[in-house]
Design a protein with these regions (language model features):
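C-terminal catalytic histidine-bearing segment of alpha/beta-hydrolase fold enzymes
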Residues: 232-236, 240-281
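Active-site nucleophile loop of the alpha/beta-hydrolase fold
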Residues: 175, 179-188
Length: 281
């Protein structure tokens, strides 16, 4: 009997070690698969318009803040717009590569901000799920604490993999609204609905239910990277008020172009000012 107990304890230790090893290996592998900062090369530097380092304790977190006048040099005081929007960029791009869709809003009096995830652009570190959350939270805190925005005047917009940190921020911090463009249910579920790993990075399907602000979701009807059905399912899980905008597009990266750039900016600006109107639900 004692021998059996000893054997069971040994087997239990082996199982625990295998699980721990699988977690470590799985995390490392999925980080390598998920993040591709090597393709994010928009060539900005510290002298680029609106660049600011919002890092603490000697760790650089590269951010860009434009507005309300586009192209304000960083040497001038960053003017406070009537509302701010945080753009959480996609995978194979950095923060400067994602601003093209929104930066004209700065001319209308809004503050447009973005941050690079760890390992992207000029941000220090290596990309991880938690690192993405941390940098986006830091930009939010910086806008509220340093620039004086009210939390309800900060909108967060996440594109593609950026839907993960955007949804996490909206689920854990008070914000004025959440915009998701071509979002996924979770990162691994883009490839398979079956959970193959002990981790499920960027679990939007679990977090969206905790979002209490207005939600706007856009998705290409024939998206060639993230299935349209995932954006639709995420919309069904979201709380009211919410709005779903299908876009006749098969290009994952060009939603604003296929929707119409001027229409897109009007849609975003209207959401920032008015949330979801009754007739838009």
């Amino acid at each position: 009997m004692a021998m059996i107990k000893k054997l069971l304890k040994s087997l239990l230790r082996i199982v625990i070690l295998v699980i721990m090893l699988g977690f470590v290996v799985g995390t490392s592998c999925i980080n390598t698969i998920m993040f591709h900062p090597e393709f994010a090369r928009d060539g900005y530097d510290e002298k680029s318009p609106g660049y600011v380092d919002i890092g603490t304790n000697g760790v650089r977190i590269a951010a860009v803040v434009r507005g309300p006048e586009r192209g304000d040099p960083p040497s001038q005081e960053l003017r406070r717009g009537k509302k701010a929007i945080i753009r959480c960029h996609g995978n194979a791009e950095d923060m400067m590569g994602t601003l093209w869709a929104l930066e004209d809003l700065a001319e209308e009096g809004y503050t447009v901000a973005a941050v690079d995830y760890p390992g992207y652009g000029l941000s220090d570190g290596s990309p991880t799920e938690e690192g993405c959350y941390r940098n986006v939270h830091r930009l939010y805190d910086w806008l509220v604490e340093t620039r004086g925005f009210k939390p309800e005047d900060v909108i967060v917009d996440g594109f593609s993999i950026g839907s993960g940190p955007a949804t996490e921020l909206a689920a854990t911090k008070p914000v004025g609204g959440l915009i998701l463009e071509a979002p996924f249910l979770s990162a691994p579920r883009v490839v398979t609905r079956i959970r193959l790993l002990p981790i499920d990075p960027f679990p939007n399907l679990e977090r969206i239910v905790d979002v209490k602000c207005p939600v706007l979701i856009m998705h290409g009807t024939k998206d060639n990277v993230i299935p349209f059905s995932q954006g639709k399912e995420l919309f069904e899980l979201a709380n009211e008020p919410k709005r779903f905008v299908p876009v006749m597009s098969n290009d994952h990266n060009l939603l604003p172009n296929h929707y119409g750039e001027s229409r897109y900016r009007e849609l975003i600006a209207d959401f920032m000012e008015n949330g979801i109107k009754e007739e838009q639900k």
